[in-house]
Structure formats: structure tokens, C-alpha cells
């Protein structure tokens, strides 16, 4: 799966599953501050990532991820 496909899937689940406004979804967007993703959303993200990408997110690995670009980097490192 290439980077573009990962970004499209992430964008899709942020809009469809978490109901985040499309205008808040851009590479430098901060997950908590700009997209208002809270701890309950992170629980949903664990399930969604498993569904879309086939692996389980680990909380300790997510701790250093602040932006959407970093999140996509993390997913890319796991699926490729």
C-alpha cells in the first residue's frame, strides 16, 4: 500500500467514522488540538485501524504522534 492510499483511507475513516470535518484534515493538523480527537476517539481509532489496515495500534507508540502526517508515517511503517 502506497502513501497516497494510506492518506486516503485515513481521511475516509476520519470523516466517516469519527465525523471530523474535511477542512480540519490536512498533513500538519494536530490530532488533539486541531481535530479535537480525545481519548474515547483514540479507542475507536484502534478498532478502525485494525479494520482498515489489519494491525493493532499500541498506545505507547501513539504517545509521540501529534500530527496527521506523523500518524500516516506510523501506519506506513507498519503496513510496508
Model-derived regions: residue spans:
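Phosphopantetheine-dependent thiolation modules in NRPS/PKS and related acyl-activating systems
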Residues: 2-37, 41, 45-46, 51-80
Amino acid at each position: 500500500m502506497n502513501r497516497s492510499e494510506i492518506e486516503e483511507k485515513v481521511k475516509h475513516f476520519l470523516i466517516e467514522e469519527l465525523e471530523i470535518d474535511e477542512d480540519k484534515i490536512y498533513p500538519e493538523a494536530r490530532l488533539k488540538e486541531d481535530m479535537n480527537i480525545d481519548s474515547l476517539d483514540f479507542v475507536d481509532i484502534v478498532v478502525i485501524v485494525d479494520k482498515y489496515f489489519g494491525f493493532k495500534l499500541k498506545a505507547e507508540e501513539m504517545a509521540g504522534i501529534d500530527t496527521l502526517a506523523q500518524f500516516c508515517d506510523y501506519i506506513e511503517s507498519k503496513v510496508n
